[in-house]
Amino acid sequence: MSTGWHAELELRFEHNREVTRLMRRRHVGPLAVQQPFYPEKDGSAHVYLLHPPGGVAGDDVLDISCFLGRGARAVLTTPGATKFYRSERGQSTQTTRIDVGEGGICEYLPQETIVFDGAKASIGTKVFLSGDAVYLGWDIISLGRPACQESFDTGEVRQRIEIFRDGKPIWFEQFRLHGADPALNAAFAFCAKPIVATMVYAGPADESALHAIREAVGDAARNLFSVSRLERVIVCRYLGGRMSEAKTLFRKAWEVLRETGLGKPAAAPRIWAT
């Protein structure tokens, strides 16, 4: 019998009079949301997803669902890291589903996820786009706690990202790692680097966006950061040893994609500055 939390958060955004409004919110358990902020001229809603316990333990389940109606624009982030704690019990799960209507834009930019040694974590993101809807999101994962010299020696982590447009898959990736997995130290895989990050952009862009991203991150990051394009999906990756570096590089790439793809300047959520 499960002894963990089962928390749910359901949000619905609609475009109304040049502003995106949070029209519905429903939560069960320790998941909540703050009132939206509106720091941008286009009326995009900046929303902070809150999980007051701060961590996820064995058997906990977090289900987040966000729906953006036609023309709605939202930036979703979190005030702090999500932590998956060591547990002798069952798997801890966080699933996020995002539906974006035609003409809508969703930016899903949570702070990092820290998977403690001995944790059993499953992290899944599923995105459904309609028509010309745009998605820009990242997943930044720390395997263990390198700042505390803690490596990921035991436990398990699963990550899965799926993106669909008009019901057809346009992006899919997943990995599953055990603490003793040889891939963690293999030169062809994770190279003993604890910070693994992926950013996916599904929206209008051309090759000039890739060039601009590479220019923004600079040559110093070329062994840690990569960017590639498959049809209308741009993917950035980081594999390295410093969380601050991963965040800095991804924010630079995000700024470029905002300008070249969305046609508007970067407007970082205020919570990132605290």
From Swiss-Prot:
Q: Which InterPro entries match?
A: UreD (IPR002669)
Q: Which GO terms describe its molecular function?
A: nickel cation binding
Q: Does the keyword Chaperone apply?
A: yes
Where is it localised?
A: Cytoplasm
Where in the chain are disulfide-linked cysteines found? Answer: none
Instruction: List keywords of the entry alphabetically.
Output: Chaperone, Cytoplasm, Nickel insertion
Q: Which GO terms describe its cellular component?
A: cytoplasm
Q: Which Pfam families match?
A: UreD
**Record function comment:** Required for maturation of urease via the functional incorporation of the urease nickel metallocenter.
Stated family: Belongs to the UreD family.
The protein's assembly and partners: UreD, UreF and UreG form a complex that acts as a GTP-hydrolysis-dependent molecular chaperone, activating the urease apoprotein by helping to assemble the nickel containing metallocenter of UreC. The UreE protein probably delivers the nickel.
Q: What is this protein called?
A: Urease accessory protein UreD 2
Q: Which organism is it from?
A: Brucella anthropi (strain ATCC 49188 / DSM 6882 / CCUG 24695 / JCM 21032 / LMG 3331 / NBRC 15819 / NCTC 12168 / Alc 37) (Ochrobactrum anthropi)
Q: Which gene encodes it?
A: ureD2
